[in-house]
Amino acid sequence: MNSHENRKRKRKVNIADLIAPSFDEVFFDVEAHRHTFYMLAGGRGSAKSSFVGGIRIPLSMMEDPDIHVVVLRKVGNTIKNSVLPQIVWGLEQMGILDRFRIKMSPPEITYKPTGQKILFFGLDDPAKVKSIKLPFGYVGIVWFEELDQFSGMEEIRNVLQSLLRGGPSYQVFGTYN
């Protein structure tokens, strides 16, 4: 079997092997929907973004066909080199990249079986977040990457008031150094 065929073969992945041990407890807390807000601090290389973007977000989408995800950074032009590849990394690690369609401009990831979306926005243009229209479902997950770069709780609260409507439950992640 050549290397191309080997890559195309389905492989079983143990999700626990992909999660840094420091996030085991958080993983199960999120699974059980025990909280709405998860603020995860850690230095570079702490695996917080890998956990949220690479693993938790795709799993949550596959578990609940009604939710969509919005990923936010303070500056929009940083998305293509940060959070988007982080999520793609997770899809590759879990062996499920073929179930998702990746669009670079504007950045967007679609779960092919249901049409659910991961939408990316920079808050350097906050009006874009207010005009989100989804074909079905609701925004069930919001991820603020580099949370410490946002202006403060008022900015975050304004965004959440625009996004968190019409669903039975939500999860908000904030990752920062």
Can you name each region flagged by the protein language model?
Residues 1-177:
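Phosphate/NTP-binding elements of NTP-utilizing enzymes
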